[in-house]
Amino acid sequence: MMQDLRLILIVVGAIAIIALLLHGLWTSRKERSSLFRDRPVKRTKQERVETPIESLDEGVGEVRVRTSHPQEKPSFNHLDDDDDEVPVIQHAETKSAQVKTASRQAPFASVQTDYDDPLLGGLSAEQPPHDLSRDPLLGKADESYSQPQHAEPPHVEKPAHQVAPQQHVESQQEPVAPAPEAKPQKLKETVLVLHVAAHHGGVIGGEVLLQSVLQSGFQFGEMGIFHRHLSPAGSGPVLFSLANMVKPGSFDPDTMSDFSTPGVSMFMMVPSYGDANQNFKLMLQSAQRIADDVGGVVLDDERRMMTPQKLESYKARIREVLDANTIA
């Protein structure tokens, strides 16, 4: 866009200059034609000057030299230095001849100027060339042409002044933009599992199991399994849960009297609500109570007999998760 605007200004300026030059040349032609019309007055003055010169020529006699080419400049190199009157007479005679020749060619010059090239307009030897720089019209043309040049930079720089505030506004708005929030680091979790199984490949009756589970503070709830809440009445967050050892792991309290299973599984998430160590201790006590009620045994997550070493392993896992989440 800026290049197109600059090109348009240059073309308009060039057209204005050419128009002003043509107008100035046309004005100078009119002035030359008016000068040619005034030539008869000059001829009358020159004829008056020729009269005393001719009388002087008659007094000199044969020493006078006339030239047949009035347009050529006289040469004084071949004249005798002792004769003082000859250069004066010869110069006067040559000047009179040039005046006569110019007066004869004046009508033709005035006619030819109408057909001559306006840039090469023929000028006589005595007429000084017209100074275009002194023409008042061309002086105005220079001023008018200089104005677009001074006016051009604002047009070119105007978009820059319009863009600058936008850049300044953007730079001010950048700090306001909300920084992307760092995603919180996911807490480390683990699942602790205990099993209550029947002895020697036996099964646990559903009715006995249901009574023991309810007496241990479990409530039937989501996913068709039993949950131990913070309150034995079933209120508060879930501390741990109990599911069937056989898939899909759910129960149906209405058909528990006709139900039997080789065992149940108890599990809790770490971290959990409250103290994880106390919640695990409560889950271990509930498992031991149910095992005593149904005549089963408590097994670890690998379905092996619970040992003191395995209990320490559970406690170590709880401490590891809690410490990792505390550092994070």
Curated annotation (Swiss-Prot):
Location in the cell: Cell inner membrane
Keywords: Cell cycle, Cell division, Cell inner membrane, Cell membrane, Membrane, Transmembrane, Transmembrane helix
InterPro entries from the UniProt entry: Cell_div_ZipA (IPR011919), ZipA_FtsZ-bd_C (IPR007449), ZipA_FtsZ-bd_C_sf (IPR036765)
Keyword Cell cycle: yes
Polar residues compositional bias, start-end: 95-104, 164-174
One GO cellular component term noted in the UniProt record for this chain: plasma membrane
Segments traversing the membrane: 7-27
Membrane topology note: Single-pass type I membrane protein
Membrane-side (Periplasmic) residue stretches: 1-6
Main subcellular location of this protein, as a coarse class: membrane
GO biological process terms held by the UniProt record: division septum assembly; FtsZ-dependent cytokinesis
Start-end of Basic and acidic residues biased regions: 61-72
Start and end residues of each stretch annotated as Disordered: 61-183
Cytoplasmic-side segments: 28-328
Family the UniProt entry places it in: Belongs to the ZipA family.
Subunit-level organization: Interacts with FtsZ via their C-terminal domains.
Cited function: Essential cell division protein that stabilizes the FtsZ protofilaments by cross-linking them and that serves as a cytoplasmic membrane anchor for the Z ring. Also required for the recruitment to the septal ring of downstream cell division proteins.
Protein name per UniProt: Cell division protein ZipA
Source organism: Yersinia pestis
Phylogenetic classification of the source organism: Bacteria, Pseudomonadati, Pseudomonadota, Gammaproteobacteria, Enterobacterales
Gene that encodes the chain: zipA
